[in-house]
Each structure stands twice: as structure tokens, then as C-alpha cells.
């Protein structure tokens, strides 16, 4: 154990602080002027999980779903002795009480599943708390740089900590499923996210990690190129001050990987590039839903789609003026469902070259796009169940449609597809008899252009 000794004349009210790697290990205030030697035991040269507050605060750790704190978990206040950490016990720190440090040797971190876990809470919402240190010092504080994190989870550890202003370091490159699930959910004072260097992800690893972090303005870099199911799902959901999105370099996606990732981020002005050409089920579902400051969409290069891949991707993006090209010729069920629903400033629709359709493929695709004046040509000869259902519903300025189907017998394929569009305009249809209609007439719903 290393010792630090300081000899000198200390003035009344003087404070001596010992910091290691910018982390305060211990501090001492002198009540009166004195000349003496003060010594500190530097057993804590490790970057323990450290909490700092300017005024008195309390920290309590609770457990859920039969979870039991690992016996190795300990805490120390103001550089004092290490004491075993117990659940439901309030620990006072901050201000004159000094910092609070945690350490442990728990291979599982603070959880064994997404529900069986420990959770930190602070007693005074009006006293802000800064957290620093390396989260791996809870896994093995003596060997934190080399310890395996293959089983370490910190699910919901800071859930609802509205007074938390900064996060600990999360340098692990080996992740396990649900490892950071909802870790900072509803941490409304968190302004900076930790670095996330992992390049290979695990199922649900970052799911809802920063959800409702309403003070977060910049997202961390996300260098991963190997994704996993739901890895980024809801990651920045409702981060209402987020202005900048990270680059997303992966070219092969996983089911639900970006689902709801930036849902209702109204200050996000630019979407990241999306280079992936191999898609997965619901991969981009609602990714930018409600991003009302988004004016341009990223390029979407995939030519073969997956089920629900673009479902509601830009729904409610009211300032989006131009849609990306959609070159895919091989569709999937619900692939474009509600993709631009409610995009009230969208003036031009992309070409839709596919001739073989799938159920619900264009379901409500342009629903409520009130600035749209012309529809893309719809070349498919045979329609399928619910394929064009409410596709242009409520597009009040739409006055030009070309739909070349010759078989419209599928269930619901044209239900309300042009309901609410302009009462007159240009409609172009196939020259041959349209199967499934009466006398070759195209059903319109309650209103619409067709006659043709």
C-alpha cells in the first residue's frame, strides 16, 4: 500500500485534496491553522466508480427480482475504510462529507438479467451528482484493465437518476446481451454520454440506454460494424435536445437493430449515412419517427428488402421535403408501411419500381402527405392483400396518379387508397380489364381522382 505524506503549515480553512487520474481520492479541511505532517494511504490508485456532489446527498442501492448484491461490493466515503455495500441502506456523501467510491469483484456486474438487478438512487433531486471512474472496477477493481466482461451487466443501474450529470467510463469491448440495457433511462440531467468503443455488439446491449435523457445534445461515436438483434433499439428515444447523430458504419444489419433509435428527437437536424445493403426484419422501423427538424433523408441503397424494414421510418418528419430514392425491386411484407406518414412538407414521392408486391407493402405509405401533388407510378399488375391500403389517404393536393394493375381482387388492396385526395385530376390506369372491379372501375374510398 502506497503512502503519501505532506508536511507544511496549513492555514485555517485550508483544504488538501488528493487526486489520482483526475479522481478525488480523499480530501481534508483544517479547522484551524496548524503545522503538521498529514499522511494518506493510496490504496485507491484504481479508477473506482466515484460519486461527487457539492452538497450533502445520499445514495441507496436497491435490488429487484430476487437479485442479491455480490458480497465483494464495497463502498468508501471521503477516503475512509472500505465497507461492504448492502441493499436499501442510504449512504451520505457530498459536500463536507467527501466523495463516495464503489468497488467490487462481481463477474456479473450489477445484474444477472434485464430484470434481476441492482439499481442506484439518490435521495435529493436538487443536488446534482457527477459520476466518474471505470465501471469495470465493479467487476474486478484490481485487474480492471484485463478482466473479462463477457458476463458483466449494468441493466437499469442509474434508471431515473434525474440528478446524475455525468456517466462513468464504459471501455469494455466484449459485451453481453442486455449489458447496458436502460442504464441511463430518464437521467434528465445527463449532458455527456460515455465513449462506447465496442465494435462487436450483443443482443439488446444498448437498448434504451439513453432513453429520455432530455439534456443530452450529442450522441457518442458508435464504431461497431457487427450488429446484433435490437442492439441500438430505442437508444436515444425521446432525447429531445439531441442535435447530432453518430455515424453508423455497419453494412449488414440485424433484426430490430435501429428500431426507434431516434424516436422523437425533434432537434436532430441531420440523419447519419446508412450504407447497409443487407437489411433485416424491422431494422429501420420508426428510426426517425417524430424527428421534426429533419429536412433530408439518407440514401437507402438496398435492392432487396426485409419484413417491416422501413416501417414508419420517417413518420411524422414534418419538415422532410424530399424522399430518398427507393431502388428495391424485391419487396417484403410491410416493408414501406407508413414510411412517410404525416410528412406534411414532402412535395415529391420516390419512384417505386417493384412489380411483385407483398401484403401491406405500401400500407399508408404517404398517409397525410398534404404537400404531395403527384404519385409515383405503380407498375404492379397484380395487387395483394392490403398493399395500397390508405396509401395516399388525406393527400389533399394529390391530383395525378398512375396505377397499372389488372387484378385488384386481393382483400383490402385499394381500401381508402385515395380517400381525401383532390376531387379531380389525372388518373392513368391499365388498358386491359381490371379483374375484381365492377365494370373496370377503380374503387376510391370516400373521395378521390379515379375514373380514368
PLM segments and residue spans:
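Short, intrinsically disordered N-terminal pre-domain segments
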Residues: 1-15
Amino acid at each position: 500500500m502506497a503512502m503519501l505524506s505532506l508536511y507544511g503549515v496549513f492555514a485555517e480553512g485550508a483544504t488538501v485534496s488528493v487526486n489520482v487520474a483526475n479522481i478525488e481520492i480523499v480530501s481534508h479541511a483544517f479547522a484551524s491553522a496548524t503545522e503538521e505532517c498529514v499522511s494518506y494511504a493510496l490504496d485507491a490508485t484504481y479508477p473506482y466508480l466515484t460519486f461527487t456532489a457539492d452538497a450533502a446527498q445520499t445514495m441507496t442501492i436497491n435490488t429487484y427480482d430476487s437479485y442479491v448484491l455480490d458480497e465483494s461490493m464495497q463502498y468508501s466515503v471521503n477516503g475512509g475504510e472500505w465497507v461492504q455495500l448492502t441493499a436499501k441502506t442510504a449512504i451520505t456523501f457530498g459536500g463536507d462529507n467527501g466523495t463516495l467510491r464503489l468497488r467490487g469483484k462481481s463477474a456479473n456486474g450489477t445484474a444477472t438479467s434485464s430484470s434481476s438487478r441492482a439499481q442506484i438512487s439518490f435521495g435529493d433531486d436538487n443536488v446534482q451528482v457527477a459520476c466518474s471512474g471505470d465501471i469495470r472496477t465493479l467487476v474486478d477493481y484490481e485487474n480492471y484493465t484485463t478482466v473479462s466482461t463477457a458476463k458483466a451487466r449494468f441493466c437499469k443501474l442509474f434508471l431515473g437518476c434525474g440528478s446524475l450529470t455525468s456517466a462513468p467510463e464504459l471501455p469494455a469491448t466484449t459485451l453481453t446481451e442486455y449489458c447496458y440495457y436502460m442504464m441511463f433511462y430518464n437521467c434528465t440531467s445527463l449532458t455527456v454520454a460515455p465513449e462506447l468503443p465496442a465494435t462487436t455488439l450483443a443482443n439488446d446491449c444498448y437498448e434504451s440506454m439513453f432513453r429520455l435523457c432530455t439534456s443530452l445534445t450529442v450522441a457518442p461515436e458508435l464504431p461497431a460494424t457487427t450488429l446484433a438483434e435490437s442492439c441500438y433499439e430505442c437508444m436515444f428515444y425521446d432525447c429531445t435536445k439531441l442535435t447530432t447523430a453518430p455515424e453508423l458504419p455497419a453494412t449488414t444489419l440485424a433484426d430490430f437493430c435501429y428500431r426507434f433509435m431516434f424516436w422523437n428527437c425533434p432537434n436532430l437536424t441531420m440523419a447519419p449515412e446508412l450504407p447497409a445493403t443487407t437489411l433485416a426484419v424491422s431494422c429501420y422501423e420508426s428510426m426517425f419517427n417524430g424527428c421534426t427538424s429533419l429536412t433530408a433523408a439518407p440514401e437507402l441503397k438496398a435492392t432487396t428488402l426485409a419484413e417491416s424494414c422501413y416501417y414508419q421510418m420517417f413518420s411524422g418528419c414534418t419538415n422532410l421535403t424530399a424522399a430518398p430514392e427507393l431502388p428495391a425491386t424485391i419487396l417484403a411484407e410491410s416493408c414501406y408501411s407508413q414510411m412517410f406518414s404525416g410528412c406534411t412538407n414532402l412535395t415529391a414521392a420516390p419512384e417505386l419500381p417493384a412489380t411483385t408486391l407483398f401484403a401491406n407493402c405500401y400500407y399508408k405509405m404517404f398517409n397525410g402527405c398534404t404537400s404531395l401533388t403527384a404519385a409515383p407510378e405503380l407498375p404492379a399488375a397484380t395487387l395483394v392483400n392490403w398493399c395500397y391500403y390508405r396509401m395516399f389517404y388525406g393527400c389533399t393536393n394529390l391530383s395525378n396518379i398512375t396505377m397499372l394493375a389488372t387484378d385488384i381482387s386481393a382483400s383490402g388492396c385499394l381500401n381508402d387508397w385515395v380517400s381525401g385526395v383532390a376531387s379531380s385530376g389525372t388518373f392513368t390506369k391499365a388498358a386491359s380489364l381490371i379483374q375484381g372491379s365492377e365494370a373496370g372501375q377503380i374503387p376510391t374510398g370516400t373521395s378521390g381522382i379515379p375514373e380514368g
